[in-house]
Amino acid sequence: MSKGKKRSGARPGRPQPLRGTKGKRKGARLWYVGGQQF
C-alpha cells in the first residue's frame, strides 16, 4: 500500500505541473490516465 501510493503519487505529481501547463487538454488526459482520477 505504501509503495503503491508513493508510485502513483510520484508519477502523476511530476507530469501534472509540467504537462498541465503546456498541454492542459492532451497533457491532462495523459497524466490523468497515468494514475490519478481515471
Curated annotation (Swiss-Prot):
Q: Name one GO cellular component term.
A: viral capsid
Where do the segments described as Disordered lie?
1-38
Keywords carried by this UniProt record: Capsid protein, DNA-binding, Host cytoplasm, Viral genome packaging, Viral release from host cell, Virion
Location(s), subcellular: Virion; Host cytoplasm
Show the GO MF annotations: DNA binding
Principal location listed in the UniProt entry? virion
Q: Which domain of life is it from?
A: Viruses
Q: How does it assemble?
A: Interacts with F protein.
Similarity comment: family membership: Belongs to the microviridae J protein family.
Q: What does this protein do?
A: Mediates ssDNA packaging into virion, it locates to the internal surface of the capsid, thereby displacing the internal scaffolding protein B during virion formation. Protein J binds to and is packaged with the viral ssDNA. Additionally, protein J plays a role in viral attachment efficiency to the host cell.
Protein name per UniProt? DNA-binding protein J
Gene name of the record: J
